[in-house]
């Protein structure tokens, strides 16, 4: 998903683009290839972008972070972390400290969501930057060093929308949604004194309002408003929904632009509605996808974007000269096979740009990435993808074959379907046999039959060739289930030992299918009860929803069930008959704790780890007796032992036996973490793949015991894989042991720490400092130790106050000590 996109004014072959959770990228060959320019450890959640286009300032860029709709997982939203700046043409980035809270798990700053960022090219004496944040408009006169709020007030609502844009002469327009202080449409000639120019007939109810200034006549400005309930244009949208949208054109006449000084024209009646299908009607999806753009040289060509791109050749003065030029395939309707994408394009539009040297050429950022047309004027607009190495895909799930050494990978992609590859080549194509928001999947042992699901619990059995082309299909989600009880990503689990058995959730009910192999391919899009049986035990209360399913490998036939309200259940002999669904002893955590995963040791079904994804609840619980007792295991992933504070959201986990050791992995909203020893609240998790995965969201982890294949799905940077043979492949440490004496003082410290090590033989020590989230604070420090007492002096004068961990590795034995810097 791309909201941030811009040409470099110095060279239009240089394009900068930011993924909504994938980081900042730069292309110097017009999108033929891309290089990620934010470091793996830096902010990945990029929502808007701007270049300072003034002469001599062109190397200065800014991007904003965080989006309030779109970057969310299960019960968790993903916040940004302020404004970032580049002074070398976008090759490297640094945060503007006054805008960053460094608390990505807490909505505690105005700059946690940014919708738009603009610079004033008319001002040569000041470095003026405007930012539209959650409910507020800010201005900086010194390139982001300091900021002053221009419009807005207390931010009490999550969904508070704003936008800001500026003419080449420095006239600023801003919008603020109707649930905010200073709601309305605003105009300023100096960016400091503002007048509300909202027309008296404009809807009193509106959420997001986006701005489109006419480049050929900057006195003309379009405003496209979402959720104008009861006003503007009514449209029926897919899945039985409806919405209202308004489109207005403002023209400045005189004075301060209010009253007779500004002319308003309501163009809402030309917003496309009553099309042949609900997919064709205009749909902003509650403000998620919304853009309006006026062509640079033809003011009659105006494009509005929601799920689709709609082009008008008369400025939307009538509904007769409009056409779909991107998004969904024209005429799409609900049901598999009945809908798809416009050729070589993608739904859900966010940003539109025109090539400066040839404004027939347009590029567009949407949920599918970046796309380009050579001629936006053509009756049928043709597109090409620019996603060549632009690795910003968002995965909900990953599935692998159970067969050792198989290269088959399947991924459930946000708004990019269920995709597969049969190759481990990094340049391999992932083909899509099933469109939508890809969800859970199962792969039969023959690697020909696939069980694929998308959003809202739609499931198909498909026979695919090795290019993932459909050879046959059959819909198979139970006809007797109430789909209103399904989750957005509805849990499905294929039995770990038997590819003929599958488990399925329906709210508080559990289903099983013991006859997958005999589901016939009839090319039917109708639900089917074939092979499905419902367990008679239903979970209480009726409103409860199953959120996680996990089946055991050895011993087989144990099924664990997680829910949205912390409760965990176990089913023994889950593969036959009507076994009891037994609630396990209560876990001492908040009742709202949302279980996203239950990791099972593949060689011991009694060892499990529960993952709760909410912020401000304790995230990880470990059991070695099948859930009869529980121990906290999040350790340094939590700020406080209660789970409160600035700990990340934990997403998924794996327990991996490797020889005599066991590796524990946890995917979080700030990266992948590992440990080889669970030690309650003192468990030390170390960040893994800091130079590759970095702080990207790790949403899903899967492991194949047969050959050690580990696959990680990220929500923003695609899929990663490796093979494991020992714990040392991930952690260069063994068990914590007391084979040497070590003393640290003082603790807490101010700036210096003394470490005294007593050792029997000469050896080498590696010292690494980690922050509270297990992230390395720099390069390892190596010290030669000699038999007897050794003293190591560590300087922490450049460190911020807080909790840190000092790791000492001597002869592959590890000692970790928590320190506090005051």
How should each PLM-predicted stretch be described?
Residues 67, 730, 748:
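Active-site pre-Tyr helix/loop in NAD(P)-dependent dehydrogenases
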């Amino acid at each position: 998903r791309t909201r941030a996109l811009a040409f470099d004014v110095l060279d239009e072959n240089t394009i900068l683009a930011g993924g909504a959770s994938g980081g900042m990228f730069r292309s110097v060959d017009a999108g033929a290839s891309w290089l990620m320019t934010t470091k793996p450890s830096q902010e990945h959640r990029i929502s808007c972008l701007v270049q300072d286009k003034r002469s001599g300032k062109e190397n200065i860029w800014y991007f904003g972070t965080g989006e309030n709709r779109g970057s969310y997982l299960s019960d968790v939203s993903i916040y940004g972390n302020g404004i970032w700046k580049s002074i070398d043409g976008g090759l490297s980035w640094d945060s503007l400290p006054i805008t960053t809270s460094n608390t990505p798990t807490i909505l505690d700053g105005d700059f946690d969501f940014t919708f738009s960022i603009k610079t004033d090219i008319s001002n040569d004496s000041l470095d003026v930057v405007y930012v539209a944040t959650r409910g507020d408009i800010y201005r900086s006169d010194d390139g982001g060093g300091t900021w002053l709020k221009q419009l807005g007030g207390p931010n009490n609502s999550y969904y508070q929308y704003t936008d800001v844009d500026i003419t080449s002469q420095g006239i600023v327009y801003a919008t603020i949604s109707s649930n905010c202080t200073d709601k309305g449409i605003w105009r300023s000639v100096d960016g400091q004194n503002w007048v509300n120019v909202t027309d008296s007939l404009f809807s009193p109810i509106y959420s997001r309002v986006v701005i489109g200034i006419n480049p050929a006549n900057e006195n003309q400005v379009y405003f496209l408003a979402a959720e104008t309930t009861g006003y503007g244009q009514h449209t029926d949208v897919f899945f039985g929904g409806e919405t209202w949208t308004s489109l207005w054109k403002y023209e400045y006449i005189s004075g301060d632009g209010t009253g007779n000084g500004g002319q308003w024209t309501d163009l809402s009646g030309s917003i496309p509605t009553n099309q042949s299908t609900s997919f064709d009607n205009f749909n902003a999806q509650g403000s998620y996808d919304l853009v309006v753009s006026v062509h640079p040289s033809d003011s009659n060509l105006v494009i509005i974007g929601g799920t689709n791109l709609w082009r008008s050749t008369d400025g939307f003065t009538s509904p007769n000269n409009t056409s779909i030029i991107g998004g969904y395939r024209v005429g799409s309707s609900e049901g598999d096979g009945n809908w798809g994408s416009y050729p070589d394009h993608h739904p859900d539009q966010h940003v539109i740009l025109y090539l400066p040297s040839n404004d027939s050429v347009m590029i567009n950022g949407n949920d599918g990435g970046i796309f380009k047309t050579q001629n936006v004027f053509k009756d049928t607009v043709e597109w090409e993808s620019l996603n060549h190495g632009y690795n910003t895909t968002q995965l909900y799930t990953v599935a692998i074959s159970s067969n050792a050494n198989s290269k088959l990978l399947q991924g459930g992609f946000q708004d990019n379907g269920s995709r597969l590859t049969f190759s481990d080549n990094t340049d391999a194509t992932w083909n899509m046999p099933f469109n939508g928001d890809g969800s859970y999947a199962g792969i039969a042992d023959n690697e020909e039959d696939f069980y694929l699901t998308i959003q809202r619990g739609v499931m198909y059995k498909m026979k695919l060739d090795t290019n993932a082309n459909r050879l046959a299909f059959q819909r198979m989600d139970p006809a007797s289930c109430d789909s209103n009880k399904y989750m957005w990503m509805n849990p499905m689990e294929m039995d770990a030992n038997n590819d003929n058995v599958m488990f399925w959730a329906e709210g508080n009910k559990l289903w099983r299918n013991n006859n997958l192999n005999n589901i016939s391919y009839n090319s039917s899009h109708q639900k089917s009860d074939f092979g499905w049986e419902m367990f008679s035990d239903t979970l209480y209360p009726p409103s409860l929803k199953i959120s996680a399913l996990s089946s055991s490998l050895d011993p087989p036939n144990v099924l664990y069930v997680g829910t949205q309200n912390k409760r965990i259940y176990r089913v023994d002999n889950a593969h036959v008959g009507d076994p009891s669904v037994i609630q396990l002893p209560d876990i001492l955590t908040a009742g709202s704790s949302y279980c996203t995963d239950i990791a099972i040791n593949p060689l011991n079904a009694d060892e499990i780890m529960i993952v709760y994804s909410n912020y401000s609840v304790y995230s990880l619980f470990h059991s070695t007796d099948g859930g009869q007792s529980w121990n906290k295991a999040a350790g340094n992933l939590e700020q406080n032992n209660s789970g409160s504070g600035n700990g990340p959201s934990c997403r998924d986990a794996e327990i991996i036996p490797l020889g005599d050791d066991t590796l524990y992995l946890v995917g979080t909203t700030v990266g992948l973490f590992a440990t080889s020893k669970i030690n309650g609240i003192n468990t030390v998790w170390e960040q893994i793949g800091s130079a590759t995965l970095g702080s990207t969201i790790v949403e899903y982890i899967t492991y194949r015991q047969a050959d050690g294949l580990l696959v990680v799905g990220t929500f923003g940077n695609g899929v990663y894989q490796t093979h494991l043979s020992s714990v040392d492949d991930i952690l260069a440490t063994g068990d914590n042991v007391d084979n040497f004496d070590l003393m640290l003082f003082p603790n807490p410290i101010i700036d210096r720490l003394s470490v005294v090590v007593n050792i029997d033989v000469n050896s080498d020590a590696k010292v690494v400092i980690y922050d509270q989230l297990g992230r390395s604070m720099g390069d390892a420090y190596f010290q030669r130790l000699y038999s007897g007492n050794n003293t190591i002096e560590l300087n922490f004068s450049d460190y911020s106050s807080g909790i840190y961990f000092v790791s000492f590795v001597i002869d592959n034995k590890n000692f970790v000590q928590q320190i506090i810097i005051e």
